[in-house]
Amino acid sequence: MKRDLVLVIDFGGQYNQLIARRVRECNVYCEVHPYNLSVDEIKQMNPKGIIFTGGPNSVYGENSPLCDKAIFELGVPIFGICYGSQLMSHILGGKVATAPVSEYGKTKVDVNIESKLFEGVSSSTICWMSHTDYIEKAPEEFKVIGNTPVCPVAAMECEDKNLYAVQFHPEVMHTEEGTKMLSNFVYNICGCTGDWKMDSFVEKTIEEVRQKVGNGKVLCALSGGVDSSVAAVLLSRAVGKQLTCVFVDHGLLRKNEGDEVEEIFGPNGQYDLNFIRVNAQERFYEKLAGIEEPEQKRKIIGEEFIRVFEEEAKKIGTVDYLVQGTIYPDVIESGLGKSAVIKSHHNVGGLPDYVDFKEIIEPLRLLFKDEVRKAGLELGIPEKLVFRQPFPGPGLGIRIIGEVTAEKVKIVQDADAIYREEIANAGIDKEIGQYFAALTNMRSVGVMGDERTYDYAIALRAVTTSDFMTAESADLPWEVLGKVTTRIVNEVKGVNRVMYDCTGKPPATIEFE
């Protein structure tokens, strides 16, 4: 049975993925496509609704992204957001101009609650504005259904044609009733049924993979991260022992993480698959000896991983399919819009060029990260793995500033384990987007037990974020930071100082290297 589809047409807005996530939270399937998607392509997709995103341009500017006017004649409900609202007005005969007063931040908007878009919404509601242009005059067929003191057309509708537009951003959390507005659009206006459920997705994908693979052999590079783990379990459910997972332990994992991965996926684990663990720690340390530049470290770790994986793949022999944990943000960012679960060979991550196989299987390519976690829970994967903290591909190699050595790896592993343990003990682990300890390349003088020390400084990092594109430093309780600091300097040999990084992103990145 074909599911309902809402298309998000991307005009360059920073929140395009967030819009799609919010729609999916309403249990409606949603895809993001570029603004130059043709009307014929849209017809073939047969969407129940279309959402135009925001964007940084002015609709009257040269080379600004526009859309075909024919899209408004398809009879499909359309919801324009910010730039998308201005675009709708501009193409249909309204007037868009530079606003006398720009609006940015939380703004009280008066709305007409008789509109289907604002059913169940307060007549005066807090919304997030971010615009320098505005709709000075709505198109003739449109009715104004929202305004602020300086924005006469904060929302408008043409109910007969199911066209709706708002100047604010209903998708961001600062718009207090934004989720309700999006729900009204997909249900009250588009007539969606809410058929996007994770249990049905998992069942359908397992059956698709089973039919495709048949008796073929499948190979998966298992990192122990959320994406590759969920992909591996899903494939295991579909084809069992036809799947071989290769886990390369490069010695740059968090404390005990390699053993935890083997405990879950290895011979004594709960999954029906073949598991190979390659202990390549010394090999990676040798390659990284004397290397301090971050990008060079990344490159060495990536290339060596491919070499190790290639060697193991050759031992297995020819495989029919290679599994990759590609998720939907990767698809959007690569400009690929098609939604097939299994597709032909293309190079993602370097591995396909070095392994002999027929096709790639990407079972998670329709899912956002939060949906991957939901799929993991649906598959019965332990919560400690499903909600594992994000971890970079190069591992601790980029959480050790400067040269990587076995001694430094142990220091940062021990410090990070203490930090994660105390965050969990305080019950705030689910409130923080990402948190970890890093080893600086700085040594400082200290005093411990009446003895002078000259040891390393550990930097603690914790951020809150909804999308990892921007982030703010987490306001951790001093009591927690104090306990973490005391434990690290007392329990981790080679450390006499602990610092907390208060920098946001931007200007800093979340990782140190």
UniProtKB/Swiss-Prot annotation:
Keyword annotations: ATP-binding, Glutamine amidotransferase, GMP biosynthesis, Ligase, Nucleotide-binding, Purine biosynthesis
A GO CC term assigned to this protein in UniProt: cytosol
Active site: 82 (nucleophile), 169, 171
Name of a matching Pfam family: GMP_synt_C
Catalyzed chemical reaction(s): XMP + L-glutamine + ATP + H2O = GMP + L-glutamate + AMP + diphosphate + 2 H(+)
Protein's UniProt keywords contain Methyltransferase: no
CDD domains referenced in this protein's UniProt entry, alphabetically: GATase1_GMP_Synthase, GMP_synthase_C
This protein's pathway: Purine metabolism; GMP biosynthesis; GMP from XMP (L-Gln route): step 1/1
Domain GMPS ATP-PPase, residue spans: 196-388
Binding-site residues for ATP, renumbered to this chain: 223-229
GO molecular function, one term: ATP binding
EC number: 6.3.5.2
Presence of the UniProt keyword Nuclease in the record: no
Domain Glutamine amidotransferase type-1: 5-195
Taxonomy, superkingdom: Bacteria
Matches recorded under InterPro entries: Class_I_gatase-like, GATASE, GMP_synth_C, GMP_synth_GATase, GMP_synthase, GMPS_ATP_PPase_dom, Rossmann-like_a/b/a_fold
Enzyme class, broadest EC rank: ligase
SUPFAM superfamilies: Adenine nucleotide alpha hydrolases-like, Class I glutamine amidotransferase-like, GMP synthetase C-terminal dimerisation domain
SUBUNIT field: Homodimer.
NCBIfam families: guaA_Cterm, guaA_Nterm, PRK00074.1
Role of this protein: Catalyzes the synthesis of GMP from XMP.
Protein name: GMP synthase [glutamine-hydrolyzing]
Organism of provenance: Clostridium botulinum (strain Eklund 17B / Type B)
